A protein has these predicted regions:
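Extreme N-terminal "head/tail" segments of very large remodeling/mechanoenzyme assemblies
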Residues: 1-120
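Conserved aromatic-histidine-acidic binding/catalytic patches
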Residues: 27, 31, 181, 185, ...
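Generic detector of ordered secondary-structure context
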Residues: 35, 185-189
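Amphipathic alpha-helical surface "interface" segments used
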Residues: 63-67, 171, 175, 218-225
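Glycine-rich phosphate-binding loops of NTPases
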Residues: 85-186
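Mid-to-C-terminal oligomerization/interaction "stalk" domains of large proteins
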Residues: 189, 194-225
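Interface faces of extended alpha-helical assemblies
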Residues: 226, 230-233
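Conserved small/polar residues in nucleotide/adenosyl-binding loops
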Residues: 236-238
Length: 240
């Protein structure tokens, strides 16, 4: 099973550093203004990658400005999978969120140096991660990010990203919408849930050529009869 295991804020949303485990039933409590909505929106953005559908009021600062205000601002998502976790590093490039996939469990030493400062340049972060860990190219398209996460990865340029899918569905569009409605307390009717399940299924048409199986069965039957006849004749010959 694959799931979002941890979220890490580094100089993000007024948070100098925080690691939050998400690997179970998590209950967020606190008075108004302590950061519950801030955390939930960052989690939701992992699933829908849509800054216009995070429930941020128009009068508030944009997602990019609030969550990634500095060159050394990052949000890291650690995703658990069957063969070990990987990370999604979210950062700001040319004024908007971009991503890199890191094929290893999260380590704070990647981003925080010996002086307990968050690194700002990619070269030093890459050096801290090490050459043995596989790191993806930069993903700047939110549509491409959703395709990677939800398994719509049959294009040649996404072959290297297949191991990062949390589900495998080329028709996943209603899945992030459903998660979004849950996070934003929107209406979820039965028809929408049913449609989501149907569309998330693999709709590849599987054609079965019955003639092939019919011929194979016929050949097997003929061979079986020949062997049986040979054995019967051999037994008769021995008895004589």
């Amino acid at each position: 099973m694959r799931y979002l295991n941890k979220i890490v804020f580094l100089n993000s949303a007024h948070i100098p550093y925080s690691e939050i485990q998400l690997d179970g039933n998590v209950h967020f409590i606190g008075t108004q203004g302590v950061g519950k909505s801030t955390l939930l929106r960052a989690i939701l953005f992992f699933y829908n990658a849509d800054k216009l559908r995070l429930g941020i009021p128009k009068e508030k600062r944009s997602y990019d400005e609030f969550y990634l205000p500095y060159a050394n601002s990052f949000i890291v998502y650690e995703v658990m999978r069957e063969n070990g976790p990987y990370c999604v590093m979210a950062f700001k490039q040319q004024g908007r969120v971009a991503y890199r996939f890191i094929d290893a469990p999260y380590q704070s030493s990647w981003f925080v140096n010996e002086r307990r400062e968050v690194r700002a340049d990619w070269i030093s972060i890459r050096k801290a991660i090490g050459t043995e860990t596989q790191i993806s190219r930069i993903v700047v398209s939110y549509q491409e990010f959703r395709d990677i996460i939800f398994g719509n990865n049959r294009r040649p340029d996404l072959i290297g990203f297949r191991k990062y899918a949390i589900v495998e569905s080329p028709n996943y569009q209603n899945i992030p919408r459903t998660i979004q409605n849950v996070f934003l307390n929107s209406k979820l009717d039965a028809d929408f849930i049913k449609d989501t399940i149907i569309r998330s299924m693999n709709e590849e048409e599987v054609n079965i050529d019955l003639d092939v199986y019919r011929n194979q069965t016929k050949d097997f039957e003929q061979n079986y009869n020949d062997v049986t006849l040979w054995l019967d004749l051999s037994l008769i010959h021995i008895s004589e």
